[in-house]
Amino acid sequence: MSWQAYVDTSLLGTGKIDRAAIVSRAGDSVWAASAGFNLSPQEIQGLAAGFQDPPSMFGTGIILAGQKYITIRAEGRSIYGKLQKEGIICVATKLCILVSHYPETTLPGEAAKITEALADYLVGVGY
């Protein structure tokens, strides 16, 4: 399956996530993204750096696609953020970072479960 297919099928295809991307763990490239979910080089570098020191994300927040999210969880492989009733789930694997945005109609736990499950699968196949 291509990286774009993971975004389109495994994330957006659930109907719970409305925008998503997969970026390199090094923060140097976007591997796949949904239409209109434009992550700048500075944003993905900042996100990748946040996984080196997750607690630092509580001070800076998460800036993605021009929006600043308040960090509500930052530990291990997962960084979660919230902006009013919508939010962002970021999960790192060995080689990539999954970024899922959920709308106010999706519960945060639903979006986290979907994104974490895809991360588990990718880890299991060596990514």
Curated annotation (Swiss-Prot):
One GO-annotated biological process of the protein: actin cortical patch organization
Location(s) in or outside the cell: Cytoplasm, Cytoskeleton
CDD domains the record matches: PROF
Main location: cytoplasm
The keyword Cytoplasm appears for this protein: yes
Gene Ontology molecular functions: actin monomer binding; guanyl-nucleotide exchange factor activity
SUPFAM superfamilies linked to this entry: Profilin (actin-binding protein)
Entry keywords, A to Z: Actin-binding, Cytoplasm, Cytoskeleton
Keyword Zinc: no
Cross-referenced PANTHER family: PROFILIN (PTHR11604:SF0)
Family from the record: Belongs to the profilin family.
Protein name: Profilin
Organism of derivation: Schizosaccharomyces pombe (strain 972 / ATCC 24843) (Fission yeast)
